[in-house]
């Protein structure tokens, strides 16, 4: 199989099959909901949809989203932007992706999903992106509904009563959950960046969505333990809101929360929330 074939298969598999950790989390959420409830019905439909999409090799959501590739920079000579775009164009022609790329100026559709800046491609060092192995290529497909629910805050925030500390960070994250309600296709998954600038905040937050929901608890220094504690607190408090699947009420509003911190300058303190819907389409391959 050629590198191009591997990339086409990566797009196909990411589009049609959720990672096992996400499927397990959805199934666990279903068991927590009351039989006969709207929440249970929603999650039953989600699980049935996932099974059918995987079996037939078709997109599990009609919005095949923005494609973001993270590529080990050691592969740059082999996995070029042109090669990735050709693979995306082939995947589109084969029906693995919807024609989902529109020019914001004249409204025309890029029928192969390829244009300047589309798909999004980052060449990175593996250690800088969660779960990316040496010689790895990772893909996230993030739909527009969930992208619309992503937010960025600047602390202090007088409206939230949020200061420049982890309590203020938590207030921002929970506000994002409340404002999303069911519009982001809950139950969602949050990738969060604390610090950085406005651009790196969103890049870092989205990269956290590559982290498995069932990863081992963080160890490390006091800083890492503080972030792990914050993840647990946000997950617990968000699920206590009762927003539930699709905003129809229930015990599961979020499936997971993944938080990273980046250095900031004295004048700025950003909290960036990348909201991902239940269809957390991500996959990593090694070439």
Regions found by a protein language model. Name each.
Residues 1-192, 197-287:
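Non-transmembrane, aqueous-exposed alpha-helical and coiled segments at domain scale
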């Amino acid at each position: 199989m050629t590198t191009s074939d591997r990339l086409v298969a990566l797009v196909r598999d990411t589009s049609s099959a959720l990672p096992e950790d996400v499927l397990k989390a959805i199934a666990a959420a279903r068991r927590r909901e009351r039989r006969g409830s709207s929440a249970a019905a929603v999650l039953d439909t989600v699980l049935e949809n996932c099974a059918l999409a995987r079996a037939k090799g078709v997109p599990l959501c009609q919005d095949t989203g923005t494609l973001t590739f993270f590529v080990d920079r050691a592969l740059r000579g082999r996995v070029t932007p042109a090669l990735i775009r050709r693979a995306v164009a082939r995947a589109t022609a084969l029906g693995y992706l919807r024609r989902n790329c529109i020019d914001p100026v004249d409204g025309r559709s890029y029928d192969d999903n390829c244009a300047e800046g589309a798909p999004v491609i980052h060449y990175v060092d593996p250690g800088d992106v969660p779960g990316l192995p040496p010689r790895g290529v990772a893909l996230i497909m993030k739909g527009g509904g969930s992208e619309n629910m992503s937010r960025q805050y600047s602390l202090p925030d007088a409206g939230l009563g949020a200061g420049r500390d982890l309590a203020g960070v938590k207030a921002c994250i929970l506000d994002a959950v409340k404002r999303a309600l069911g519009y982001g296709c809950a139950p969602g998954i949050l990738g969060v960046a604390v610090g950085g600038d406005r651009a790196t905040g969103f890049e870092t937050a989205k990269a956290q969505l590559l982290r498995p929901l069932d990863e081992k608890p963080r160890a490390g220094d006091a800083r890492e333990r503080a972030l792990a504690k914050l993840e647990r607190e946000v997950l617990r408090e968000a699920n206590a809101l009762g927003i539930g699947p699709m905003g129809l009420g229930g015990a599961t509003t979020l499936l997971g929360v993944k938080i990273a911190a980046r250095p900031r300058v004295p004048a700025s303190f950003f909290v960036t929330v990348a909201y991902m819907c239940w269809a957390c389409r991500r996959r990593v391959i090694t070439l």
